[in-house]
């Protein structure tokens, strides 16, 4: 029979129908090829927004730099970066006046953090520009390489293990006349194979020393590498994002710590909290505006959009903010915090890999590296690329571009939020001194503005004043993309508000399903996603039960583990049937071994192994939880793992799930082809670094809770720990005298070797 779809919505309030408008099925778009073009776009746009500024030349690097600050006053309707320092400082002063002591307290908190942060903080994060190799690396490797180079150049403050001491080395390194680095390279030789007598190419990996003079080192230290942002939906064009190097990262971390502490105490800030906590915070602001507006007043909300937020921000403005926020603090603290914005005022952007050229016949392909863009004849390029390159040429130095204005994506989210909130704060009646007033929410570049006034003219005047006040600090509200509704309906950071925040469950749809890590993790992540959506996103019990059944079905098809008594034939069904038949307690078999599903919406919080443990045959338990199983390269057993889940919109979220390591927690082996390339040396370094860290954790099992503090090296710490443990074990009779003597001997040998080295 035909069903009229409108009947479905008869009893549903309009706001609950939002989940039916979900446009994002299928995979998001990914970028291919180089990001060079996108980076050039960013650089050219950024300079265009600030074009009336003053040009100067950096005395150290020779880079031309554009400074739009305190230049011409901004104009209506045109996005620009012409912020005025005195306006920013005044906004800061008013923010402090409305929140007495907020800056002071945040400074004290940050000082404490600075004293305690270890350098391994910088190993968090993914890709990082590694200045020693001039390309991207995992954060831990990039840090290890930087420290290694620092030490070989006589910079040793970092050995204390404190981040602040590593940063002292960074500052010192910038004064050095030259820095010596080790680079990996690859030699190819044609040799005759003894067995087959054919000529083969033999590759060897070499390391060579290279000296960088002060200018080249400074350029590298100030470089941000660029990549294309992947998986962005709803955009026609891709855009570039930046990965800073190790010299910048530590300083940025401390600035963001300070700004985060301030944001935590600003009711209009949507950062650093998230999820339900964020919704509660935002609902408060709306409630306040609704309650404080008199019955005669009108209240409107703007769902705001800013034009090119970070391309119009300016590091010099951030420097002014920090100078003001820390004005009564000790000199060292002010210096540490002002370095990040100063480095950003002098930053260089790497153009990435360059351009690919193909001949008409498609036989030949060649890559034009970014370094060649200064000298290459432009007749090879199409019209639009030619324009880009012509614009960018004056700014090019060795394949990097001088980019003084602008911030690049995602660098100072917290601090820029403080700037945004400081303008929202000026909407109080005591500052507007008229009949209209405003308040709102700010989260990085996203904002919602609530304006109250006695009549429509007042609302318009309020919005205009807000718009122009923003202009003075380099924030450009987009008149085209912002829209106004009666207060009670707006959108902010993908949360839709209609008399309360609406659960938009469809946003979470992409995270349902099988992740493809391994059988154990996938089962755990799948049920955790359903559980979390029941808690946070109004996923009802009936729908959750259905989601669970669909997930189990999906899981069984993915891993071909249909129940042992099924008729479905797959590659695995022969083995699974055999297991089914010889198992006494069939309910104890995991789903991935062809067992039945015991999950329902009441027990989603229990890992499957625990759920079925009492039901398992003894020999099955022994096989399942056997750390010595030779076929499984085991993960370290941690009680909680983190999965990255992708909502349809917005950033990837980290989600915790319980992990019980079994013989199903396998890790796929690495692709071998990397071993024949020049990356191999890098890979070996990475593995060695990993091994050292793992060994260290073995000696200090609690090191995940409290790192050993002190100046001693990792080796010394492990040796002294081994001696203490051995003595305790010997005195309590756990080990024999001979074993004790042997351990002591090994410890002495290690120390002896260290002395000789």
Curated annotation (Swiss-Prot):
Listed name of the protein: RNA-directed RNA polymerase catalytic subunit
Chain segments carrying region Promoter-binding site: 249-256
Region span, Disordered: 50-82
Boundaries of every RdRp catalytic domain copy: 286-483
Substrates-to-products reaction catalysed: RNA(n) + a ribonucleoside 5'-triphosphate = RNA(n+1) + diphosphate
Domain of life: Viruses
Residue spans of biased composition, Polar residues class: 55-64
Alphabetized PROSITE patterns for the sequence: RDRP_SSRNA_NEG_SEG
């Amino acid at each position: 029979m035909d069903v009229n779809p409108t009947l479905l919505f008869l009893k549903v309030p309009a706001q609950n129908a939002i989940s039916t408008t979900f446009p994002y099925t299928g995979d998001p778009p990914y970028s291919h090829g180089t990001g060079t073009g996108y980076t050039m776009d960013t650089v050219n746009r950024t300079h265009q927004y600030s074009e009336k500024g003053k040009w100067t030349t950096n005395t150290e690097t020779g880079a031309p730099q554009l400074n739009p600050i305190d230049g011409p006053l901004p104009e209506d309707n045109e996005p620009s970066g012409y912020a005025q320092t005195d306006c920013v400082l005044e906004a800061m002063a008013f923010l402090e006046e409305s929140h007495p002591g907020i800056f002071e307290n945040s400074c004290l908190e940050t000082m404490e953090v600075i004293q305690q942060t270890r350098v391994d903080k910088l190993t968090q994060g993914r890709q990082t520009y590694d200045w020693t190799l001039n390309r991207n690396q995992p954060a831990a490797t990039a840090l290890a390489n930087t420290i290694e180079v620092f030490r070989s150049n006589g910079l040793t403050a970092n050995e204390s293990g404190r981040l602040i001491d590593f940063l002292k080395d960074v500052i010192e390194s910038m004064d050095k006349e030259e820095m010596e680095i080790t680079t990996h390279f690859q030699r190819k030789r044609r040799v005759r194979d003894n067995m087959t007598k054919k000529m083969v190419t033999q590759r060897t990996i070499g390391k060579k020393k290279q000296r960088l003079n002060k200018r080249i080192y400074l350029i590298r230290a100030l470089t941000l590498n660029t990549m294309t942002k992947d998986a962005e939906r709803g955009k026609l064009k891709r855009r570039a994002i930046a990965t800073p190097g190790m010299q910048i990262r530590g300083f940025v971390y401390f600035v963001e710590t300070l700004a985060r502490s301030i944001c935590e105490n600003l009711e209009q800030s949507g950062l650093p909290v998230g999820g339900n906590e964020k919704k509660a915070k935002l609902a408060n602001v709306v409630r306040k505006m609704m309650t404080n507006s008199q019955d005669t007043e009108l209240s409107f909300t703007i769902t705001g959009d800013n034009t090119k937020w970070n391309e119009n921000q300016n590091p010099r403005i951030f420097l002014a903010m920090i100078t003001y926020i820390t004005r009564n603090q000790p000199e060292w603290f002010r210096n540490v915090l002002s370095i990040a914005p100063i480095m950003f005022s002098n930053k260089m952007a790497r153009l990435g890999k360059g351009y690919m050229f193909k001949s008409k016949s498609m036989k030949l392909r060649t890559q034009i590296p970014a370094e060649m863009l200064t000298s290459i004849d432009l007749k090879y390029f199409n019209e639009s690329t030619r324009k880009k390159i012509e614009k960018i040429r004056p700014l090019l130095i060795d394949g990097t571009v001088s980019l003084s204005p602008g911030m690049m994506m995602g660098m100072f989210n917290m601090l820029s939020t403080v700037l945004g909130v400081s303008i929202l704060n000026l909407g109080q009646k005591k500052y507007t001194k008229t009949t209209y007033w405003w308040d709102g929410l700010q989260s990085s570049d996203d904002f919602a503005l609530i304006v109250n006034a006695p009549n429509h003219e007042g609302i318009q005047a309020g919005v205009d004043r807000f718009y122009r006040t923003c202009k003075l600090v380099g924030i450009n509200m987009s008149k085209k993309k912002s829209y106004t509704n009666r207060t009670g309906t707006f959108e902010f950071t993908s949360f839709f508000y209609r008399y309360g925040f609406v659960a938009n469950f469809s946003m979470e749809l992409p995270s349902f399903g099988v992740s493809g890590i391994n059988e154990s993790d996938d089962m755990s992540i799948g049920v955790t996603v359903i559980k979390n959506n029941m808690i946070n996103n109004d996923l009802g019990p009936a729908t959750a039960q259905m989601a669970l059944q669909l997930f189990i079905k999906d899981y069984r098809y993915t891993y071909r583990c249909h129940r042992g008594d099924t008729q479905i034939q797959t590659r695995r069904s022969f083995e699974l049937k055999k297991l089914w038949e010889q198992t006494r307690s069939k309910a104890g078999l995991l789903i991935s071994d062809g067992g039945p599903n015991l999950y329902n919406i009441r027990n989603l919080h229990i890992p499957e192994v625990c759920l079925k443990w009492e039901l398992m045959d003894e020999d099955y338990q022994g096989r399942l939880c056997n750390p010595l199983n030779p076929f499984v390269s085991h993960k370290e057993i941690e009680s909680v793992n983190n999965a990255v889940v992708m909502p349809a919109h917005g950033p990837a979220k980290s989600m915790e799930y319980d992990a019980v390591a079994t013989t199903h927690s396998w890790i796929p082996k690495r692709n071998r082809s990397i071993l024949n390339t020049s990356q191999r040396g890098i890979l070996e370094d990475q593995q060695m670094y990993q091994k050292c860290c793992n060994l260290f954790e073995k000696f200090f099992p609690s090191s995940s809770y409290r790192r050993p503090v002190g100046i001693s090296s990792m080796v010394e710490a492990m040796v002294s720990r081994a001696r203490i443990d051995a003595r305790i074990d010997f005195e309590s009779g756990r080990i024999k005298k001979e074993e004790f003597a042997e351990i002591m001997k090994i410890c002495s040998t290690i120390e002896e070797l260290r002395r000789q080295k």
